[in-house]
Amino acid sequence: MSSAMLELILEATLDTLYMVALSGAVSALIGIPLGVLLYVTRPGQILAQPFAQRVLAIVTNIGRSIPFIILMVAIIPFTRLIVGSSIGTNAAVVPLIIAAIPFVARLVEGALNEIPPGLIEAAQAMGATPYQIITKVLLPEAKGGILNGLTITVVTLVSYSAMAGAVGGGGLGDLGIRYGYNRFDPLIMLITVAILVIMVQGFQSLGDHLVRKADHK
Amino acid sequence: MIKLEGVSKTYGAGPTAVHALKNIDLDVPQGAIHGVIGLSGAGKSTLIRCVNLLERPTSGRVIVDGQDLTRQDAEALRQSRHQLGMIFQHFNLLASRTVFDNVALPLELMGVSKSDIRERVEPLLDLTGLTDKARQYPAQLSGGQKQRVAIARALASRPKVLLCDEATSALDPQTTASILELLQDINRKLGLTILLITHEMEVVKSICHRVGLISDGELVEEADVGDFFTAPATRLGRDFLNAFLELEPPQALVERLEETAGPHTHPVVRLAFSGATVATPLISRLARDSGVDVSILQAKVESIQGRTLGLMIAELIGSPDTTSRALTQLEAHDINVEVLGHVQRDA
């Protein structure tokens, strides 16, 4: 294999890591508060807003039901508005974030669901404000579950980012399609898949490690 | 210290409405340990949760230390809740926090500084016997230790009142005893007013000064614990007491019991006597003075809140005249007599 080829592979790997890291971080930043909001505005919860909650839940579900490949194409005008282009890794990050936000939000909501309601009640009995309940009880108690959700998200983003390659997004998916599929080079195909497998394994192990550290049950 | 005035709680409306509490009046003086006992579903939990407004009463007033909590806005209520510690059946500790940090939580919520938190948490860990567990997580503790953490946590804000929601129901008898001892200790040392709800007579017997009996959302009976154990005023009170004392007449006799006296029957009585009468040779004197024979079926002596309580189930064997004289004599000696029924002679 030529050194140019190796360079190509390295570049694609870094592109993938960049897309996953950036979209993972931004979707966590927005998705976690959204998941908390979905939880605390439920009927009977500390900031109950049943109607707003319903609307939010529907919007979240719509976001989750659109297939990524369609979403990616459908929001091209929006992507162009944000990053000024519809191709390249930065352009791929936008749909990745849009797709991951509702995903993270639902996983966070699920993690919060696992908290025994008695804990919220105990905090209320201590005179905690809703904000204190979120920061001192809900988030710390759901930390393990949230980290687990983020791990799943990152792994999903690895495969989504490969899909982004289909529309000129760069990264390992792009490389695999252009060289492995279009030029029918089984070695490149094998290498890109192997790197993706290793990446997913790595993220999963890291996630599991963090979850174990957060969990005192 | 705690005053409930006409507190009612209704869930839902119309014909399907559930009246969990009906017009409850309760007055717990400063420094008292007040128990409320009842079967599950009677409204105990709703009652105690109305005191710190975890449940907002549908009507009525909740007054704690002179403040009407039902009229306070959210912020004032949060401040008032610092005066009301609460512990729960399932402890409700934060799994993500160490013992120390669990106890520190209410202080963090109040905005107490880090150094002051340390100063206030350590004596509490000492009081509850948890000093060597400070760095452990709740998952590493036994049920009794968890409840001790919960008690320390409830005391951290220096409340005037401690609410105990079935605090010992998830614990084994030995652990229950040690937790009750701790609560009593706190009551004495800190002068803390304690309101507890329970379905266990043991809890009432061990530490309560007064007891209320709740049934179907109503407070049907209230008495000093000694009086309640001597002579419960209601059927439900007697059922609770008899089940607790395991003081039931033998099954074979129960089957023969008749409600009304006949010419050839003699009474079966439940006698409860407390204080000085326990020490007197009551039965032999009764037999000598009234001429009845006394057949003791069950007897037991209990110590409740420092008072000795004697309980007995006996048949009084004699003519209708002599047995009725015996009953009068017993009552004259300040003995609580309950006629359980009558059995046929020579049956």
Swiss-Prot record, chain B:
Instruction: Say where the protein is mainly found.
Output: membrane
Q: Which reaction does it catalyse?
A: L-methionine(out) + ATP + H2O = L-methionine(in) + ADP + phosphate + H(+); D-methionine(out) + ATP + H2O = D-methionine(in) + ADP + phosphate + H(+)
Gene3D superfamilies from the UniProt entry: 3.30.70.260, P-loop containing nucleotide triphosphate hydrolases (3.40.50.300)
Gene Ontology molecular functions: ABC-type D-methionine transporter activity; ATP binding; ATP hydrolysis activity
Give the first-level EC class, as a single word.
Answer: translocase
What SMART domains is this protein classified in?
AAA, NIL
Q: Name the InterPro entries on file.
A: AAA+_ATPase, ABC_transporter-like_ATP-bd, ABC_transporter-like_CS, ACT-like_dom_sf, MetN_ABC, MetN_ABC_transporter-like, NIL_domain, P-loop_NTPase
Q: Any idea where the ABC transporter domain is?
A: 2-241
Q: Where does this protein hold ATP? A: 38-45
EC numbers, comma separated: 7.4.2.11
Q: Name one Pfam family in it.
A: NIL
- Where is this protein found? Cell inner membrane
GO cellular component terms attached to this protein's record: plasma membrane
Question: Where on the tree of life does the source sit, at the highest rank?
Answer: Bacteria
Annotated membrane topology is: Peripheral membrane protein
Keyword terms, alphabetized: Amino-acid transport, ATP-binding, Cell inner membrane, Cell membrane, Membrane, Nucleotide-binding, Translocase, Transport
Function of the molecule: Part of the ABC transporter complex MetNIQ involved in methionine import. Responsible for energy coupling to the transport system.
PANTHER family the record matches:
AMINO ACID IMPORT ATP-BINDING PROTEIN, METHIONINE IMPORT ATP-BINDING PROTEIN METN
Q: Family per UniProt?
A: Belongs to the ABC transporter superfamily. Methionine importer (TC 3.A.1.24) family.
Q: How does it assemble?
A: The complex is composed of two ATP-binding proteins (MetN), two transmembrane proteins (MetI) and a solute-binding protein (MetQ).
Q: What's this protein's name?
A: Methionine import ATP-binding protein MetN
Native source species:
Chromohalobacter salexigens (strain ATCC BAA-138 / DSM 3043 / CIP 106854 / NCIMB 13768 / 1H11)
Gene name? Answer: metN
